[in-house]
Swiss-Prot record:
Cellular location(s): Virion
Organism: African swine fever virus (isolate Tick/South Africa/Pretoriuskop Pr4/1996) (ASFV)
Family label: Belongs to the asfivirus I177L family.
CC terms in the record's Gene Ontology section: virion component
Protein keywords: Late protein, Virion
Induction: Expressed in the late phase of the viral replicative cycle.
Lineage: Viruses, Varidnaviria, Bamfordvirae, Nucleocytoviricota, Pokkesviricetes
Protein name: Protein I177L
Amino acid sequence: MWKVNDQGFLNISVTGTKLNLIAITGKLGFYADPPSHLIIMPLKFFPVHKFSKNEPNKKQKRFIYF
């Protein structure tokens, strides 16, 4: 389950563990609640499917797996 809190962060709850998702200038960060560990990685870490020239109208999607 996920929701956006008042500060604009995306809160993701996975099996009782609350993760907060931060997107700052092309980087993606996760930290657990309480925020003792912060992991920031570039968005290029997640592979993006590249469409061929026959599919120019389809939107690119980024998938994050837990």
